[in-house]
Amino acid sequence: MPRDLFSDALTRLRNALRVNKQTVIIPFSNLNYSFSNILLEEHLLEKKTILSKKYIKLEGLKFYNKKSDHTLFNFFKNCQRLSKPSNRLYIKAGDIPLIDNGLGFVILSTSYGLMTGKKARALNIGGELLCQFNFQ
């Protein structure tokens, strides 16, 4: 079992995207649970189910389809981990990046919990920059 469950969840999500899987099972942790809530809020998945105290099942992943030329706002192409256990990345509210001219988003861990960069900018709070999602 890996020590960094969040990185493991992102890797499983990336691998599912590469093979166009609609369902992925990620390890359960409080961070991954909050992360799956954000994916639901951003309409990047349709349903999540807690399988046991160890796993969360994410269903109905929406991703970019290479065969069609259509890209919708809620289809994502790539997710990338920014802050790592060996190299934490903290930013102020004014330094929160815009990803793909506002089409992508970042996820921050703040004192108010996990939230997207847009929400953190609105509340004027910074935090640890966990990951980013690209749509282009």
From Swiss-Prot:
Gene Ontology biological-process annotations: translation
GO (cellular component) term, any one: ribosome
GO molecular function per UniProt: rRNA binding; structural constituent of ribosome
Gene3D superfamilies: 3.30.1370.30, 3.30.1490.10
InterPro entries associated with the record: Ribosomal_uS8 (IPR000630), Ribosomal_uS8_CS (IPR047863), Ribosomal_uS8_sf (IPR035987)
Compartments (UniProt record): Plastid
PROSITE patterns: RIBOSOMAL_S8
Cysteines paired by S-S bonds: none
Record keywords, A-Z: Plastid, Ribonucleoprotein, Ribosomal protein, RNA-binding, rRNA-binding
Record-linked HAMAP family: Ribosomal_uS8_B (MF_01302_B)
Function: One of the primary rRNA binding proteins, it binds directly to 16S rRNA central domain where it helps coordinate assembly of the platform of the 30S subunit.
Assembly: Part of the 30S ribosomal subunit.
Family per similarity comment: Belongs to the universal ribosomal protein uS8 family.
Protein name: Small ribosomal subunit protein uS8c
